Amino acid sequence: MNIRKLNKFFTNLFLKFNIVTSKTVDINKLKLLINLLKPIKTNHKLIRIGGKNDGGYLIPDDLENIDCLFSPGVSDVASFEQDLIKRIKGLRCFLADFSVQNSPIKHKSINFEKKFLGSISNEKFFTLKDWITKKTKSKNDLILQMDIEGFEYEVLINTEEKLLNRFRIIVIEFHNLEKLTEEFAFKFISAAFEKILKTHMVVHIHPNNTVKHLCRKYKGLELPSVMEFTFLRKDRIKTFTKIERFPHILDRPCTKKRADFILPDFWYH
């Protein structure tokens, strides 16, 4: 069993039996974090890139002069990458995933590496810094789209603020968010969010409805287990207002097998 499958196995085990591995977090600390993550409406409208269901994400329509997309955890779905190639002339797409043999699509703009993204570089993993340094010398802006099954936290914590600032738009699927109720997990997860919030702001959130155990209720709050977050770098935001209603008109369920999971009110009100 590889590292990713082992991580997923224990995550599902914790969810199934609702195991609490540390003391519970102070509710005020949790509310403060969620307040920082509430999405805003900016001067850039949101557009849907990718498939109608899984693999499609809402991002700001601010795509001029972006040179590269870095997309770790591609698996067997690459509709997001395909769509961006059509929309951005000359875009180069760098894909990575150790769990598959090849890129799910073939295109002259696609470059695939059989590696996982992580906090170290070895025969199976590389860091975001090492990957970008190897693949591009461009000084223009980049896009990051990351779905790496829980490894997103260590990657963000390990990545320098200067490097994160290279990405104009960042899309990340965050996992195990129901563990925000646990003190130890809260410190780890909140550290990753606080890192990215130094340079970016949240412009969209969409819960993933494919997870069997959709959320944990904690002192009046609902914590969806897996959610897709879209971030826009702060210097691209000229004006912004609060978002008063979800879902967005362009949101679609990740799987058609069940109804979409609507973002709970406290995450945006």
Regions from the language model: what does each represent?
Residues 3-63, 67-70, 77, 113-114, ...:
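Rossmann-like AdoMet/SAM-dependent catalytic core
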Residues 76-88:
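Conserved SAM-binding loop of SAM-dependent methyltransferases across substrates and taxa
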Residues 95-103:
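Short, polar loop motifs at secondary-structure junctions
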Residues 109-110, 142:
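Short, conserved active-site loop motifs that form the nucleotide-linked donor/cofactor pocket
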Residues 115-119, 147:
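Conserved acidic residues
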Residues 144-151:
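Switch II (G3) loop of P-loop NTPases
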Residues 166-177:
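Conserved beta-strand signature within the Rossmann-like core of class I S-adenosyl-L-methionine
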